[in-house]
Amino acid sequence: MTPSRGAWGVVGVDEAGRGPWAGPVVAAAVVLAEPIAGVTDSKRLSARSRERAAALIRSEAVAWGVGRADVTEIDALNIRRATFLAMARAVAVVAETSPIAEVLVDGREIPDDLPAPARPVVGGDALEPAISAASILAKTLRDAEMVLLDEAYPGYGFGRHKGYGTAEHRRALEELGPCPMHRRSFAPVRRLLGG
């Protein structure tokens, strides 16, 4: 038989956290047997709807995996390469338990070191159910991590803005300076460090 969508191993991959000034970049990889009702691009869902959808994905997906690149890796590699590393890690988790025929990656580029043929899908988080599912998992898992970082590093508001460059975050950086979770390679943080 020839591989096809669903249980035969078409993996959707997406990330969350490329743009924030703090925290990791998180990627998810998902194999679906069939589309799951209510699962669409994570940016189109409320936080509550994303959480419900994430629970459905975790229970109904044929396979799923998560990869991340932390702040140290982001600063050492750059955000593009760190994102690809997180994606490759997520796909590797899926590959441990599920055969992979093809990897569909949201965006214009694909990582080099994937265990199967891959292709980019521009706007894939709205077009491909497996990428939509990956988008939701990556976003909910990263958001949960940022809430924990808010407790570990109070005063920055990570639980509210999730590390993105809001006015609140800018004020906190100016008042407190960067914490270990800030991406020193990002211009707003680098400027505060005198770079």
Curated annotation (Swiss-Prot):
Protein's organism: Halorhodospira halophila (strain DSM 244 / SL1)
**Sequence similarity:** Belongs to the RNase HII family.
Recorded hits in InterPro entries, A to Z, give: RNase_HII, RNase_HII/HIII, RNase_HII/HIII_dom, RNaseH-like_sf, RNaseH_sf
Carries keyword Repeat?
A: no
Gene this protein is translated from: rnhB
Cofactor(s) annotated in UniProt: Mn(2+); Mg(2+)
Tell me the compartments it is located in.
Cytoplasm
Q: What name has this protein been given in UniProt?
A: Ribonuclease HII
Which GO cellular component terms are attached?
A: cytoplasm; ribonuclease H2 complex
